[in-house]
Amino acid sequence: MHEKDDLPQDSIADGIENDDESNGQEEEELDPDQGTAFVDSKEDMFVDAPEELNFDTPSKEALTTDDDDNDDLGTHFNIEKGDWEKELAGLQEQFKLLTGENDLTGEDGNTTVDIVSRFSKFLKTAKEERIQHEVALKELHGVISGRDDEIADLTTKISELSSSQPVSEMGDQAQNLEHLEAATDRIMVSLSNVFGEGELQYGSSISEKLAHLENRVSFLGAKYTEFYYGADQLRKCLASDVLDLSFQEDFGSALGAACSELFELKQKEAAFFERLSHLEDENRNFVEQVNREKEMCESMRTEFEKLKAELELEKTKCTNTKEKLSMAVTKGKALVQNRDALKHQLSEKTTELANRLTELQEKEIALESSEVMKGQLEQSLTEKTDELEKCYAELNDRSVSLEAYELTKKELEQSLAEKTKELEECLTKLQEMSTALDQSELDKGELAKSDAMVASYQEMLSVRNSIIENIETILSNIYTPEEGHSFDIVEKVRSLAEERKELTNVSQEYNRLKDLIVSIDLPEEMSQSSLESRLAWLRESFLQGKDEVNALQNRIESVSMSLSAEMEEKSNIRKELDDLSFSLKKMEETAERGSLEREEIVRRLVETSGLMTEGVEDHTSSDINLLVDRSFDKIEKQIRDSSDSSYGNEEIFEAFQSLLYVRDLEFSLCKEMLGEGELISFQVSNLSDELKIASQELAFVKEEKIALEKDLERSEEKSALLRDKLSMAIKKGKGLVQDREKFKTQLDEKKSEIEKLMLELQQLGGTVDGYKNQIDMLSRDLERTKELETELVATKEERDQLQQSLSLIDTLLQKVMKSVEIIALPVDLASEDPSEKIDRLAGYIQEVQLARVEEQEEIEKVKSEVDALTSKLAETQTALKLVEDALSTAEDNISRLTEENRNVQAAKENAELELQKAVADASSVASELDEVLATKSTLEAALMQAERNISDIISEKEEAQGRTATAEMEQEMLQKEASIQKNKLTEAHSTINSLEETLAQTESNMDSLSKQIEDDKVLTTSLKNELEKLKIEAEFERNKMAEASLTIVSHEEALMKAENSLSALQGEMVKAEGEISTLSSKLNVCMEELAGSSGNSQSKSLEIITHLDNLQMLLKDGGLISKVNEFLQRKFKSLRDVDVIARDITRNIGENGLLAGEMGNAEDDSTEAKSLLSDLDNSVNTEPENSQGSAADEDEISSSLRKMAEGVRLRNKTLENNFEGFSTSIDTLIATLMQNMTAARADVLNIVGHNSSLEEQVRSVENIVREQENTISALQKDLSSLISACGAAARELQLEVKNNLLELVQFQENENGGEMESTEDPQELHVSECAQRIKELSSAAEKACATLKLFETTNNAAATVIRDMENRLTEASVALEKAVLERDLNQTKVSSSEAKVESLEELCQDLKLQLENLRVKEEKWHEKEVELSTLYDKLLVQEQEAKENLIPASDMRTLFDKINGIEVPSVDLVNGLDPQSPYDVKKLFAIVDSVTEMQHQIDILSYGQKELNSTLAEKDLEIQGLKKATEAESTTELELVKAKNELSKLISGLEKLLGILASNNPVVDPNFSESWTLVQALEKKITSLLLESESSKSRAQELGLKLAGSEKLVDKLSLRVKEFEEKLQTKAIQPDIVQERSIFETPRAPSTSEISEIEDKGALGIKSISPVPTAAQVRTVRKGSTDHLSINIDSESEHLMNNNETDEDKGHVFKSLNMSGLIPTQGKIIADRVDGIWVSGGRVLMSRPQARLGVMVYSLLLHLWLLASIL
């Protein structure tokens, strides 16, 4: 990167060594800026290197694309790149031939920036040389005017001498002497006008004056020859016919023409440089802007790729939704089919209903017939009953004795409880009859009859008993034993009748359910399976449909969310497209301007090179090589012609050998500029390639736009179709819903009718069954009458057995009665009747058992409550334990913090820290305080939680208080304890609040201390700065100020100790907080102990609270902090006074110079401060014992708290005492410091006054010495040497013109040699200087002409290229405008499609709501279907049994249990059922009816989902097309940004050229630096430079003519003074020759590297030294002898000499990254480091050529790698 920087600098160094040897050390002193120009240019190269690297390496992404068009562009780019490289190689070879630089071989990395920098260097050197020549011309003007005066005086004197010689010499000797003296006086007066007023003081005699005049005349002759020779050279350089004619008369015309031409060239050069720098800046800015736009476009590409991926995902989602919607459509179709099936089923039901009606009619007929039979049976029953009554009456009349038997029979029936009522009556009758037979055995016949009757009754009873036993056995098989015992036979029969009715209903419902299940379209496998499996399948299908509805709803929600996200993304993309279109418009405008500027630059460069006049006017990019070659050939020919015409022999070539070095430098700069031109053309080609790529991308955008339009049309069509489909689906759905509701109502009505009919049938059947039962009973009663007769006989036989059993029973009863009488009952329960007694005993036993059960229940409740209370107590205990753990952790943290504070204090005692560390420690302590506060807040939170827990416990205890007496007592105890704990907690909370207040106060105090510490730090830093200034300015008083700084450092150490003490105090505050935390932990422990033992804890808690109050009072004591604040205030006041004294010292030193006195040593009292600080630290570190310990018992807690309070009090006392001593020591130290500083100030004031008096004395002595030197020099000269001096001057002029001219041109002296040799021969020094300056002026004019021609050619080439670029940019802008219009149309279409999408989204929302409703219904129906399937399977299994027999009750119960598991919204409106029918039956019918509706809804939902998926897929396609369009636009924007950056670089290069040419007179407004205006300004500057060069040539010719006239006059004078030559030859020739040889043979200064010589100067004055040398208005050549020469230069060229260019104009200022405003505040440190690395790297590269070579090799390899990767 820096390889091209070394070559021009080496050539510059050689040129300075070989060409500028005559300038010497004097010009180095007067023009120190001359050598630093190259350093500045070097800095330019280092600063511009990163931009060049960015400029030379185009991005790989911009050149390598995946399309075939990009491959073609790559090949085209490689071809143009090879052409530019060839052109660059040719330019470099031509530059080598012109400059003679052989070291440039192998350079491939030269860029336009490097070439422009070389041209700028060359123009700088030309400007410097031009200024020197202008100064020399002014000096020559002064000398010529003096010489004219001298010639006039000499002519007058010669005329007087010639007129006075014919007169007698002896007689007129006195008069001649008087005339000679007058002539010498006049000559001296004339010389005083040239050499100064000191000429009048040389010599008092005529001989001395004449000797002095001889020396002056010889000097003037030498100067005249030099001026004449220089004017001749200028005349030859200017080469005008007018000058050739006028030069013989006046050689000053050549000088005037040269001056004017150089002035014009200088103006043109400055304008050209300014323009060129401006163009370079613009070009650089443009390239940067292009790079930024490239990066933006790349980011946009990535974003678009992401959007593409998202759109693809959305497409897949849309396809999925479409599929789901298609499935929903199919399901909807299935639902329609189900609707048709339901209609068919409804028709079947109507037919079935008609059949049922016919059956009802038949059953009514059967009922009527049964009623007839019922009437007949009733008649027969009445007859039979009449007969039976007669029989019973006869029996009653005949045997009264049977009543007792009947009574006994009743008693037996009651005891046994197994016989029927009729049997009991018979038994009682038999018992009565038996008793009657026993009592009265009146008639045997009557007894026989009675026995027969009894036998008949017994037979009847036995028959009846057998029937009853059979019924009981049958019923026992049906019912359980418990049910059999609990019910009698009649009830059992009644229950059987009711069950029969229910079973008939269930069978009917079962049949209906079976028919409904059969009517449902089930698979073949399920249709053949059982009813339970069918119901299970229906339930599973219902649940599955419900899940599908949920899934569809979720998908619809996700689709809606994705659509909303896509809408947002579309809006963002639209905004980004608008921004990109705006940026594209801007880039098009800039690209158009850049192309126009480029073309104009190329055109102007071609015009300035002069090729336009030769027929080379129009050039394309392919002819630039030929144009540049021809321009360089022309320049080379001009240089050769000028060199051949100027000198005709080898001696002249040797004389201009030094000028060839300068030309080498010029051509190296030209070569660099041409390289930059090639780079610019390369960039232009890159821009053209990028524009082609942009055009291709625009075409691609158009294609994508067409595709987008097609996609939009398709999407619109699809959206229209979707809308139609959705509207149709909605209409169909609404119609289906309405049909479904109608069918439901019809089905409900039919069902209700069917249910009513079924109920009627059931009622009729029940009545029929009742009649049948009555008939059966009557028939059975008739049969039983016969059986009763037989039973009477059996009863007689059993009578005896019963009597025996009764006797046994009587004995048992007597025993039982005796045992009952023995039982002792309460008074309330006592009674005489044993049965009542037994009953009461049974009731009492039952009551006792119930009381026991209740007591057990209450006990269990109490136990449960106690368990709950214990669990809650355990929870509170665990919470308290957690609080204790938190407190223990807080204590550990606090102890750790205290240990860390102790370690910090120990470290502070060992090492003396600075104030910054003290502030950092204070901040760390503050942070630790914050941590402690945080822990305290956590403890408070824990305490609050404990209070809450306790309050919860209290509330729970209050609730449990009213349950049991024991629980109430425990509750009261716990409540009391809790209240006590609550009071203690409130007290602890108050103490913690007080502690918080104290901590807040301490924090405020610490904040004030930290602020004071910061102020102290500021004061100390200011003191350090002032002391450093004193050290720098007062070099002679360095020791005293060092002692003062030591004293200040000691005081700073004292301040540091004070800060350490403050930090110790802060540590003590932290320790106090730790103690507070320990106390709080102990309080918590005490609270826990109080929970166990409440008696002793109250008194001890009061003691703890008192101790805490004492600690709180101690902490609130702010005496120590107030003392610290007072001490710090006093300290800061004293330090402010010290600061004021130091400022007075520095101000006096700054005003009056160096210090010249010694200040008193400051006393070092650091030992005393250290001892006091150690005492203070020891006092701070003294802590009361057992402060950190935790008391094991409650007594020890109180004692430890008391000890802690006492320890804190003692600590405060010790701190106060030690702090007072420390404050007094600090005050004494500050007082001593004040004394020392006041003494130092007085000393400084005295020193300043003494220095001022010494300076005045030195000035007076210098004036005296100067006057003495003037008088001595005047006495040394004699007027008698005037004639010899004139002859020597003429001879010296001739010799110098003939022999010594070349030696004088080649003469170069170093600093020391120049001063030493100037003491021996001042005339020769001035002659060599003038000749050298004239030659430099001529060479500079030639160089300026050559560079102007080169600039003209390059400007013309650049103008043509810029014109081409502007045309291309206009084309690109037109295409871009079209693309923008198309994009706007696409956006309108997109907005319309978005509106459509929004409408579709609204429809989707509606469908979503419908789907949600349907999903809920579907879930319910699905559950019902599953349950129905199970029921159906069970019914299928039981179908055969149901046909023959009724369904068992157990199966029906399981069926209805499963139905109850299904949730149905409403079952009240089930058609075909009676409203009084059971709920389970209604639910079953509702489930069966809802299956078809759910299937239909599922189909509708699946269809809607498919349609939504299709719409989503279409919208995904639309979004993807829009993203592709935005990506294409981003690529075009990237390419346009690239072109803009390259044009900005080109414009910045032109601005730099203009800046170099215009210097401080800007031609273009800096606020409006457009490229076209820059090109125009550059053209104006070049033309002005050409005009200036022409005027300088004419002026040089005029000066040459003036010199020729003066030479003629000198020749005339030399002829007249031939008689004086013989006397002066022996005196002047030999010393002159010796001096010249010695001067010419002086060794040159060692040719060291100029970079090493310039390094220090460049490092010290990068900003202060301007690249243009500022010539002083008076240049003096100081000599060691008494001969002094001062040449006064008029102020005509002040505006040229003082035209100092600032570093900012040249780009030499190193601007930091932080000053640029581009770096945020977070990255300032990194930016400073980068700046430091940059500057240090620049210095290293300046001082180490190996590093430069390494960097160049690395950059070359990097370029090769990039080219390989691109190709």
UniProtKB/Swiss-Prot annotation:
Residues 1767 are vesicular. Residues 1-72, 1177-1198 are annotated as: Disordered. One of its GO terms (cellular component) is trans-Golgi network membrane. The chain crosses the membrane at residues 1749-1766. Keywords: Coiled coil, Golgi apparatus, Membrane, Transmembrane, Transmembrane helix. It is a single-pass type IV membrane protein. Disruption phenotype: Increased sensitivity to high concentrations of NaCl, KCl and LiCl, and also to mannitol-induced osmotic stress. Altered localization of SYP61 and abnormal partial secretion of vacuolar proteins to the apoplast. Enhanced root skewing and epidermal cell file rotation (CFR) probably due to microtubule destabilization, thus leading to abnormal cell morphology in mature regions of roots and the base of hypocotyls. It is found in: Golgi apparatus, trans-Golgi network membrane. Residues 1177-1190 have a biased composition (Polar residues). Residues 276-436, 493-516, 570-590, 684-805, 845-1082, 1251-1310, 1362-1424, 1522-1542, 1603-1630 form a coiled coil. Expressed ubiquitously in roots, leaves and flowers, and, to a lower extent, in stems. Residues 16-32 have a biased composition (Acidic residues). One of its GO terms (biological process) is response to lithium ion. It comes from the Eukaryota. Residues 1-1748 are cytoplasmic. Tethering factor involved in vesicle fusion at the trans-Golgi network (TGN) thus being required for efficient protein trafficking to the vacuole. Implicated in resistance to salt and osmotic stresses. Modulates the cell morphology (e.g. epidermal cell file rotation (CFR) and cell expansion) in mature regions of roots and the base of hypocotyls as well as root skewing, a process leading to root movement within the soil in order to maximize anchorage and nutrient acquisition, probably by regulating microtubule stabilization independently of their orientation. PANTHER family: CILIA AND FLAGELLA-ASSOCIATED PROTEIN 58-RELATED, TRANS-GOLGI NETWORK-LOCALIZED SYP41-INTERACTING PROTEIN 1. Interacts with SYP41. This is Trans-Golgi network-localized SYP41-interacting protein 1. It comes from Arabidopsis thaliana. The lineage of its organism: Eukaryota, Viridiplantae, Streptophyta, Embryophyta, Tracheophyta.
